[in-house]
């Protein structure tokens, strides 16, 4: 699979999430509630809930909050209902962006997403306008020190994974959506809770951003999109060049 993000770019996005932990937890709970309402409280026969729980655990959502979310969703008095929507568009420089959202007000969310794209010179397109530039698949990440690349590769293949990439910080395992839960369970038994585990959009190829102004505008757009309570995840087919990353490292836009 082409277009793997460099570890520094991954760490930038993860750092932003770490600084907004409460908001991340809120989004994880929303996905759990939606999964239960769409299926059942039993993850064994509810693949979406199984995936939501795996993602929640990888982000260290406390067990008591997970249990509370499941019980709340199963309560007949709970009238929370969220619709899953995917927005697609282009950021400046032809960068393809996919935004996944869960919302109880589609008009509000569409207006927020469109406003974010417009503010930073992007264009919101129709659903399907950029997804052909990505592969929809499972992503599981472990820190490099958990095991050697050879051992991770052997275990991942045995588990049924499609691909694995190891860099200076992370082992990243890619799976078919259908095999995601099985592969994650196998790896969890072997290596413990993953650092990241989710179903997302991985770019088939990436565009290298080597201009400071373009990088700042792009990252501000992504951060603004992620600020929305309705937005679950944002994906893009870009990487920061080493030079641009070093220039921006330590700035508010990277550390925010």
UniProtKB/Swiss-Prot annotation:
Cross-referenced InterPro entries: Integrase-like_N, TACO1_YebC-like_2nd/3rd_dom, TACO1_YebC_N, Transcrip_reg_TACO1-like, Transcrip_reg_TACO1-like_dom3, YebC-like
Region: Disordered, residue numbers: 1-21
Pfam families: TACO1_YebC_N, Transcrip_reg
Keywords: Cytoplasm, DNA-binding, Transcription, Transcription regulation
Taxonomy, superkingdom: Bacteria
Coiled coil ranges: none
Annotated Gene Ontology cellular component terms: cytoplasm
Localization: Cytoplasm
MF GO annotations: DNA binding
SUPFAM superfamilies linked to this entry: YebC-like
One GO-annotated biological process of the protein: regulation of DNA-templated transcription
Family: Belongs to the TACO1 family.
HAMAP family: Transcrip_reg_TACO1 (MF_00693)
Protein name as it appears in the record: Probable transcriptional regulatory protein A1I_03240
Organism expressing this protein natively: Rickettsia bellii (strain OSU 85-389)
């Amino acid at each position: 699979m082409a277009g793997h993000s460099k570890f520094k770019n991954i760490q930038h996005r993860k750092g932003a999430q770490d600084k907004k932990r409460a908001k991340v937890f809120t989004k994880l709970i929303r996905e759990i509630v939606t999964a239960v309402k769409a299926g059942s409280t039993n993850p064994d026969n509810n693949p979406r809930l199984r995936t939501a729980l795996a993602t929640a655990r990888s982000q260290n959502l406390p067990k008591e909050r997970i249990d509370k979310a499941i019980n709340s969703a199963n309560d007949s008095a709970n009238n929370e209902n969220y619709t899953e929507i995917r927005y697609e568009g282009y950021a400046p420089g032809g960068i393809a962006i996919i935004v996944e959202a869960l919302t109880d007000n589609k008009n509000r969310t569409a207006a927020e997403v469109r406003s974010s794209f417009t503010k930073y010179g992007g264009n919101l397109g129709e659903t399907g306008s950029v997804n052909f530039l990505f592969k929809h698949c499972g992503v599981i990440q472990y820190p490099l020190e958990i095991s050697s690349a050879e051992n991770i590769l052997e275990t991942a293949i045995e588990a049924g994974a499609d691909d694995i990439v190891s860099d200076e910080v992370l082992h990243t395992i890619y799976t078919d959506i259908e095999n995601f839960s099985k592969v994650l369970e196998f790896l969890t038994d072997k290596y413990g809770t993953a650092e990241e585990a989710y179903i997302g959009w991985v770019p088939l190829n990436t565009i290298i951003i080597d201009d400071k102004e373009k990088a700042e505008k792009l990252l501000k757009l992504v951060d603004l999109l992620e600020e929305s309570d309705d937005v679950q995840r944002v994906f893009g087919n870009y990487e920061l060049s080493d030079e641009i990353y070093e220039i921006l490292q330590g700035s508010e836009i990277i550390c925010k």
